Amino acid sequence: SLISLQKQNSILTGEHDGISWLPDVAFRVGEFGRLEFTHQEQDYYMQWMPPSLINMQSSPEYLLAQMEYAGVDRAVLQHDRVYGHLDDFLGECIKKYPNKLVGLAQVQEWRAGEPEQLDRLKYQVLEQGFRGVYFSTGGFFHVDFNMGVNDSSLDSFWSLVEELNIPVHWYAGEYRNPMMEIYLRELEDFDIWAKSHQNITSVLTHGLNNISMLRGQPDSVRYQLPEVMVRLLKNENWSIELMLHLMASDTPYPPYNSNLDKLVEDLINEIGIEKLMWGSDMPCCERTLSYKQSLVLYKEKCEFLTQDQRDLITGGNLEKLYPL
């Protein structure tokens, strides 16, 4: 029988960080949102997606039905490698529903400056209709984290991104210990990059991941804006995706966590309302709450918000990046 496995369980931890120390645990994708592993003849699972994702598939029609129920007009599809190389599938989705779905291109981040990946990006944008690119530093796992976003091998990639005039959606996704120290160092790297690439529009996805990393800490420590994050987001052309319901997913009902209201207010005061963008992480969000409920914090709570400000957070600001 399968036994539930927590994400930080030592079974999944190699001797060091990177693909060279990847443990052999017979990894496989299961059903009902589960990832499965075997260790010492015992099978384990991790609940990665909600159980409602029976066969780990989400058709565009399924997403559109969810959007209609939640009152969402358009969606941005963040194309992380962990979902697979979905260039053709997502390309078909956005061509079929161009007024509903915006696609982000994908590259192998550690090889992004190589001709093959440059051609791949050009094809996704110019032929398949992708309008931005998703870039996760988790990709550096494939080279044992021996490079970063400011590596000179990526210069040709950034030049192409600027030439194509597309936004970058960033994920500080190394996710290795010491967790907070690495996360803050990644934000520092992004800030260095931002100052050298001021013509490229950027969105920091999975905003305020520090909240998730600091579980168990006092609220006064956990629900703080890191100084480096504020500094990064003050760069021109930088915005942040607010996914606060997942960062505080251990609380009973995140939209009613008053610490999150305070963070939204602090962000407005520090960087301005025009840089804030709601993100759901659908279908992942349904491990915590429904797609519709992921909007509650911005549509119903945060009493200091005007209606115009609510509209900007829940689509208006993103609409400026990807107008119809």
Regions from the PLM with identified roles:
Residues 58-63, 85-91, 115-121, 186-191, ...:
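Alpha-helical scaffolding within the catalytic cores
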Residues 2-69, 73-74, 265-266, 270-277, ...:
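Mid-to-C-terminal alpha-helical segments outside catalytic/metal-binding sites
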